[in-house]
Amino acid sequence: MLYLVGLGLADERDITVRGLEVVKKAERVYLEAYTAILLVDKAKLEAFYGRPVIEADRELVETGSDDILANADKVDVAFLVVGDPFGATTHTDLVLRARELGIESKVIPNASIMSGIGCTGLQLYNFGQTVSMVFFTETWKPSSYYDRVKENVQIGLHTLVLLDIKVKEQSLENMARGRLIYEPPRFMTVAQCAAQMLETEEERQEGVWGPDSLAVGAARVGAEDQKLVAGTLQELTQVDMGRPLHSLVLLGRRAHDLEKDYIRRFAVDEATFDAAWQNGKYGSS
């Protein structure tokens, strides 16, 4: 049996009781280590689980899935995923490959950023499509996310923006030369995301958002040192949210007064927040 086990958002204690039971009985335990990171290292997981954990990078999961699934028709294999197991399409692919091989699979769900973002006080049913923000380069600044956010904005819904992480990535030069040299890990910050959003708007010029649009930055959701900051996009380009992982929510104009009251506590500057709320006509249907 292949088990996909959600680990939750913060540390080794966030696994569910059912998930821990699976981990303890499995023949092999893999930790998916590239679509998201847990806020503790692998050694802490191993100490808590009382058994070794095999780190599964992008290459192993996407091209070596048969190695992960080896003998899973006879023994239990646990595949651990930060957040919820189906937070990335790669994990769906793994289940489909297991089906092709006649291997049964079972999912043990857990909290993910999609539900955890409720810690901002923004009501989950007021969210529209979720988008991803990748690191821009000098020659590559994709803006396809802009159109999805535009649809959310047009109907007044919040947008959760998931921020890029680069783990065990190669430079183009090293890839071209066939050298297995990896770049240092990089994790996008709320400040970088806000700056890139303003850069995209400057390029597109469709008025979907602007420097005075309100947003909420969230860091290390679910952890003891979770941090929330609310403000305009311009203000958020200057905030330091600390260590990863970060997310950003662009507020929709249908935001409720209860949501305003909740997030105002985290404002960079309450007077600026109040002015942006009023001038942006937030709270209107």
From Swiss-Prot:
CDD domains given in the database record: DHP5_DphB
Major place of residence: cytoplasm
**Pathway linked to the protein:** Protein modification; peptidyl-diphthamide biosynthesis
Q: Which domain of life is it from?
A: Eukaryota
Keywords for this entry? Cytoplasm, Methyltransferase, S-adenosyl-L-methionine, Transferase
Subcellular location(s): the record lists: Cytoplasm
List positions binding S-adenosyl-L-methionine. Answer: 9, 84, 87, 112-113, 163, 221, 246
Q: Which Pfam families match?
A: TP_methylase (PF00590)
Protein function? S-adenosyl-L-methionine-dependent methyltransferase that catalyzes four methylations of the modified target histidine residue in translation elongation factor 2 (EF-2), to form an intermediate called diphthine methyl ester. The four successive methylation reactions represent the second step of diphthamide biosynthesis.
Report the protein name in the record: Diphthine methyl ester synthase
Gene giving rise to this polypeptide: dph5
